From Swiss-Prot:
InterPro entries reported in the protein's UniProt record: C1q_dom (IPR001073), Collagen/C1q_domain (IPR050392), EMI_domain (IPR011489), Tumour_necrosis_fac-like_dom (IPR008983)
Comp. bias intervals (Basic and acidic residues): 784-800
Region annotation (Disordered) ranges: 133-157, 779-801
Organism: Homo sapiens (Human)
GO biological process: angiogenesis; cell adhesion; cell migration involved in sprouting angiogenesis; negative regulation of blood vessel endothelial cell proliferation involved in sprouting angiogenesis; negative regulation of cell migration; negative regulation of cell migration involved in sprouting angiogenesis; negative regulation of cell population proliferation; negative regulation of vascular endothelial growth factor receptor signaling pathway
Entry keyword set: Angiogenesis, Coiled coil, Disulfide bond, Extracellular matrix, Glycoprotein, Secreted, Signal
Entry comment describing in which tissues the protein is expressed: Endothelium.
EMI domain boundaries: 54-132
Disulfide bridge partners, by residue number: 58-122, 85-92, 121-130
Domain of life: Eukaryota
Pfam families membership: C1q, EMI
Molecular function per GO: receptor ligand activity
Protein name according to UniProt: Multimerin-2
Amino acid sequence: MILSLLFSLGGPLGWGLLGAWAQASSTSLSDLQSSRTPGVWKAEAEDTGKDPVGRNWCPYPMSKLVTLLALCKTEKFLIHSQQPCPQGAPDCQKVKVMYRMAHKPVYQVKQKVLTSLAWRCCPGYTGPNCEHHDSMAIPEPADPGDSHQEPQDGPVSFKPGHLAAVINEVEVQQEQQEHLLGDLQNDVHRVADSLPGLWKALPGNLTAAVMEANQTGHEFPDRSLEQVLLPHVDTFLQVHFSPIWRSFNQSLHSLTQAIRNLSLDVEANRQAISRVQDSAVARADFQELGAKFEAKVQENTQRVGQLRQDVEDRLHAQHFTLHRSISELQADVDTKLKRLHKAQEAPGTNGSLVLATPGAGARPEPDSLQARLGQLQRNLSELHMTTARREEELQYTLEDMRATLTRHVDEIKELYSESDETFDQISKVERQVEELQVNHTALRELRVILMEKSLIMEENKEEVERQLLELNLTLQHLQGGHADLIKYVKDCNCQKLYLDLDVIREGQRDATRALEETQVSLDERRQLDGSSLQALQNAVDAVSLAVDAHKAEGERARAATSRLRSQVQALDDEVGALKAAAAEARHEVRQLHSAFAALLEDALRHEAVLAALFGEEVLEEMSEQTPGPLPLSYEQIRVALQDAASGLQEQALGWDELAARVTALEQASEPPRPAEHLEPSHDAGREEAATTALAGLARELQSLSNDVKNVGRCCEAEAGAGAASLNASLHGLHNALFATQRSLEQHQRLFHSLFGNFQGLMEANVSLDLGKLQTMLSRKGKKQQKDLEAPRKRDKKEAEPLVDIRVTGPVPGALGAALWEAGSPVAFYASFSEGTAALQTVKFNTTYINIGSSYFPEHGYFRAPERGVYLFAVSVEFGPGPGTGQLVFGGHHRTPVCTTGQGSGSTATVFAMAELQKGERVWFELTQGSITKRSLSGTAFGGFLMFKT
């Protein structure tokens, strides 16, 4: 817009003024034509040295309005298609009808102005190559569409995320541009209003001069008035107006250069803005702002175009008026000269009078000529004064125009700097939008990652909860085993080992006493008879042999103990392997159970889908059809069952062998009988020996006594430790064998109960009911779990007969078993082991049974899913002092639970039966005292639906 405005004001205005002066005279403005080189475009100035004629070409902007079709939006519509009937069935009922969504484009008629640059002859030049100079030629008017600005295809669009500050700056810049445009229009109007006075004054002066010259025309018969006046006018114009127009042309040239540079920069900015617009997505508010801005720009463009058209019309009218005045003046002068010549040359009747008085007419000729020359001089002086006055006025006008042009140059520079700032701001906004897009993409990826992490955390949370539940069950089993072990240790009788050790010590003391008596008797016999020495020597040898025999027997006992220990370790390993095998078997059973449950759910879901697709009638027809054969033949099933039975028999034989080995080990683990005490013989003969032999014998006896004591201590320690570990291992092995044998018996009974009548099943040739099989296996597994937990719970809690609704004492875990046996659709059982003293609702957080998902452990209440009669039981272990609580039914009925124990605490249990509506809640509140914190807490809450109402 700025480029078109400045170009439309600068180019045609300068060329129009120069053309008007050039048409006034063909010879007087030659220096002006030579001085117009600085106002030509750069390309024209470069070709001046090569082709002198090329400088006569000038560029003219040409505009062309074109109409085009542009895609504005798309519309959706449905396409209906129908499958034709097959051949031979014209009235088929099952016709396949399809609908498909399609899109069609919607076009809009738009108009667009295409601007191009056309080269034409400069004002004052004609010809095919613009080589002829014609001062009378009327300059070709510029195309009326020059002031049109190429309309945008749409409103100005910015990238999303444009800041409000940038919008305010754009509005401020728009207001500044409108203000500058208004000033420029006022200046142009003022200049246009002052120019007609100058043009009107000049023809008036010329007309006055010509009229006075016509009065003296008959004085110069050989010279026309035009030849007399034109040199003077030419000289006057060259002297007074050439410097002014030269400086004016230089100013216009500099202004044109500045406008060209500014137009190039504005075009570059426009292209950059266009690229930003092409890569941006318009928003509603920015579209509205762009539409307003474009409307104002179009309005200003139209005003500038109208102003330019008015200026051109005025210049053209002035030029036409001047040309017509000069033509009329020339015609009038020619007419008068012709009349004068005719008057001088016409013959008359008074020719003699004229000839008679030539001297008398010739005498006043110098005086009249002198008077006429004086009059002409005065007229020229007045014309000079008038011209000087007009020149001063024109000088003032030109100074005003120069100041206006200077101000316009400053404003253009300011606009140029503002356009640079605007471009920088647009670039900054573009970078910010790109950063925002990158941040938005990163934020979206981070959101996706966080969602994935949250899902993973939920899965990990469920896995940890499941593992905690398994660890809790394992801990309960370990605590039960520990209690059983402590009970066994208390019942263990270790007095037999101590008696054996006392017997060994008595034997050692007897041996020592016998040695002392032998030494005394030897002393006595030595004095009495020397022959008794040989008998004593024999007795010592016998004692040595007995001691060696004791040592050998101790070594054999230690070897037997180590061998027994290794056998017990091997048995322990075998028991561990059997336990692992049993765990794997239980794991496989669980997997089969889950597979059966998944298959059952899939079958129910498929049945629902088939019912929705084909209808209940089609499903009933399909169910009434004869069932197809099984994928496996009954012979294969029979062979598989026989293999399973043989495997169970082999496993039973293996368990019998293992029991026999354990029995043998128990018999072998009994402590050996103590060796009989050997008395030395006193019947041997006596022999004499030296004193040195007796001293050596005494030392050997002392060392033998020490060795016997050491062996006794070692045997005592090893026998005690080995017996304790052996008893513990044997007890654990007995328990493991008993549990495994019972599990095998239960599996065998279950197997025979399920597949005992497989011959009848083969003869019936019907499919197995997987749902019934799954239900049977579930019930057997639950009974097995109840049987496994019964011994441990029997050791801890004992059931008491309920005389009243309110009783005291622990409650066994028979409630869950009763629920499993009854097959109630709604049942729950939960416990609370953390302990609390807050007077609020107790949240039983450990849930063992929750059939129907009606109990919410996070809130601690049960919500009835159906209307019916429910049975509830709550057992609370209160802390020291009195404790009180209440079982709340729907907020309107309360059943108290209290205890008055003053000791270390007591347990209170309450049973209640109530009819609940659907959605009513039941919970337990602590109103006084505290609840004891225990790992195996007796604080529990349970209930189930007895029947619906």
